[in-house]
């Protein structure tokens, strides 16, 4: 079974980095409602679009998701 997106993303946390992946990881860590136990693209994408307390470039999210799938 694949790790959840959140679990994988947490390995990329780095407050000193300006990379989109590190930025999203830090924002997701601070967001209590971020979906932590899913590997479903639509669920995470919908959360980012409709419910997140932060804004994030969805084009960057798509690239990060692709990297997640390839890990």
UniProtKB/Swiss-Prot annotation:
Superkingdom, natural source: Bacteria
A Pfam family: YozE_SAM_like
InterPro entries: UPF0346 (IPR010673), YozE_SAM-like (IPR023089), YozE_SAM-like_sf (IPR036806)
Matching HAMAP family: UPF0346 (MF_01538)
UniProt source species: Streptococcus pneumoniae (strain JJA)
Protein name as it appears in the record: UPF0346 protein SPJ_0886
Family named by the database record: Belongs to the UPF0346 family.
